[in-house]
Curated annotation (Swiss-Prot):
Species name: Bacillus cereus (strain B4264)
Role description: Only component of antiviral defense system Shedu. Expression of Shedu in B.subtilis (strain BEST7003) confers resistance to phages phi105, phi29, rho14 and to a lesser extent to SPP1. May be an endonuclease.
Record-level GO BP terms: defense response to virus
A molecular function (GO) term: nuclease activity
InterPro entries: SduA_C, SduA_N
Protein name (Swiss-Prot/TrEMBL): Shedu protein SduA
Keywords: Antiviral defense, Hydrolase, Nuclease
Length: 380
C-alpha cells in the first residue's frame, strides 16, 4: 500500500480519498473507494465508501465495470461479494487510518495528501507546524539546496552525532564563514549556467527561468532595494495574476515606496545594433531591441491606466496589491556587450541607451559580470 492518503474535497462536508486495492489480477481488480464525511448526527461515523469492480481498458487504465441496478433484481436473484482474510485485514487497517485522518484534520478544502505509517515524517511535520518561521527560512531559494546537501552529508556520515555537536559549538565568526562558503557555491553555480548557455541557448523561456530561480540577480541592477512581486505579471486585467491581458516578464517593487519596476527579458543572442551603417560611423539600434523597449513602455502605460481597476479587483478577491505606480521604472535585459567588437558599434549603442529617459537597457554579460563581482567580494 502507498505511504500516503490522497484526499480531494467534493463538498464542504465530504472528501473522496485514494482507492484501497483489495484484489488484483492482470486484467481485473476489486477496490474500496473511501470518503471521509462530517456526520452531524453521529460524528464518530466519519467514513463511508463503495466497493468497485474494475477492468483494465484498451488504454491500459482501470475502468469501472458496469454498475448493477439492485432495483431490477428478481425475488430469486441475489448478489454475493466475497473477499479473503488478507483483503479484509487490509481494508480494516486502511479504514482505521481514514478515521484517524478525519479525527485529526476533518474535511479540508482542496486536494492534498497525508503521510501515514511513518512516525519520523509525523515528527518532522509537527516540528515545522510548531515553528513555521523555520520552515519558511529553510525553503528560501538560496538555502534549500544547501540544506539538502548538509542533511545528506550528516546522515550518511559514520558519526552524525559528533557533526551536530560540532555545529552547535561553532562560534558566530565560524558560522558567518560557513554561510559565506554556501553563498559562494550558489553564486558559482549560477555563473556556470551562464557560461554554459550564453552562446548557444536562444530560448527566452530558459533565461526567464534562470532569472526566476535566482531573482537576486535582477536586484543587482538597481541602486535601491527591490523585491519580486510576480513573474509573468499581468498588467492589464482583473488582477496581476489574471489569465488575460498584457504580461511583463518580471514585476518588481521597492519594498519601502512600493513603486513598481517592470522588467522585460530577451536573450543573450538578441542583436543590439543593425549590421549596416546608417551613416559613416553611426549604427541604428536593432529592431529587436527597440521593439523590447517599446513593449516595456507599453506595459508601463497599460499598468498606469489599469492600476485602479487591478487594485479594486484584487481587493474584492482578498488579494493585497503589493506595488504602487508612483514613477514606475522600466528595464530591458538583452544581448551581450561583448558582441560590439567595433568602437563605432559600442558608441552607437551607448548613445542610444544613455538617451533613453524612462528605460534602463542592460546586457546579459553586464548583468552576470555583477555576479562575478559578488564572488570576488565574498572570497576576499
Amino acid at each position: 500500500m502507498s505511504d500516503k492518503i490522497n484526499v480531494w474535497t467534493t463538498s464542504r462536508d465530504s472528501a473522496v480519498c485514494g482507492d484501497i486495492e483489495l484484489k488484483k489480477t492482470s486484467t481485473t481488480r476489486l477496490i474500496f473507494r473511501p470518503e471521509i464525511v462530517n456526520n452531524n448526527k453521529n460524528p464518530k461515523a466519519s467514513v463511508r465508501g463503495c466497493f468497485i469492480f474494475q477492468k483494465k481498458g484498451r488504454n491500459a487504465l482501470w475502468d469501472d465495470y458496469k454498475e448493477l441496478d439492485m432495483n431490477k433484481l428478481k425475488a430469486e436473484e441475489w448478489i454475493k461479494l466475497e473477499i479473503n482474510s488478507d483483503a479484509m485485514l487490509t481494508l480494516t487497517k486502511e479504514i482505521q487510518k481514514h478515521y484517524a485522518v478525519h479525527e485529526k484534520y476533518g474535511v479540508r478544502y482542496g486536494a492534498f495528501h497525508l503521510f501515514k505509517d511513518n512516525p519520523d515524517i509525523e515528527k518532522l511535520i509537527e516540528m515545522f507546524e510548531s515553528n513555521t518561521d523555520l520552515l519558511t527560512q529553510l525553503m528560501e531559494d538560496d538555502k534549500s539546496e544547501a540544506l539538502e546537501k548538509t542533511l545528506e552529508w550528516i546522515v550518511t556520515n559514520d558519526n552524525p552525532d559528533k557533526i551536530i555537536d560540532r555545529l552547535k559549538n561553532l562560534k558566530e565568526q565560524d558560522l558567518d564563514q560557513l554561510n559565506t562558503l554556501i553563498g559562494i557555491a550558489n553564486l558559482k553555480k549560477v555563473l556556470s549556467v551562464w557560461e554554459s548557455n550564453k552562446l548557444t541557448n536562444t530560448s527566452e523561456k530558459f533565461w526567464q527561468s534562470v532569472l526566476k530561480e535566482n531573482t537576486w540577480i535582477l536586484s543587482q541592477i538597481f541602486s535601491n532595494p527591490t523585491v519580486l512581486i510576480n513573474d509573468e505579471a499581468y498588467v492589464g486585467g482583473k488582477t496581476v495574476k489574471n489569465d488575460s491581458g498584457k504580461l511583463v516578464d518580471f514585476l518588481y517593487a521597492n519594498p519601502f515606496s512600493k513603486d513598481a519596476v517592470l522588467i522585460e527579458i530577451k536573450t543573450p543572442s538578441t542583436p543590439l545594433i543593425t549590421p549596416t551603417e546608417y551613416r559613416t560611423g553611426v549604427y541604428s539600434a536593432h529592431k529587436d531591441l527597440t521593439g523590447a523597449v517599446t513593449q516595456v513602455l507599453t506595459y508601463k502605460t497599460t499598468l498606469q491606466r489599469e492600476y485602479q481597476n487591478i487594485d479594486y479587483n484584487n481587493y474584492r478577491q482578498g488579494i493585497k496589491t503589493d506595488f504602487d505606480i508612483i514613477t514606475p521604472c522600466c528595464v530591458v535585459i538583452a544581448g551581450m556587450f561583448d558582441t560590439l567588437t567595433d568602437t563605432a558599434h559600442r558608441h552607437s549603442f551607448e548613445l542610444y541607451r544613455k538617451e533613453l529617459k524612462n528605460v534602463t537597457v542592460i546586457t546579459f554579460d553586464e548583468l552576470f559580470e555583477r555576479v562575478k563581482g559578488l564572488i570576488k567580494l565574498l572570497e576576499g
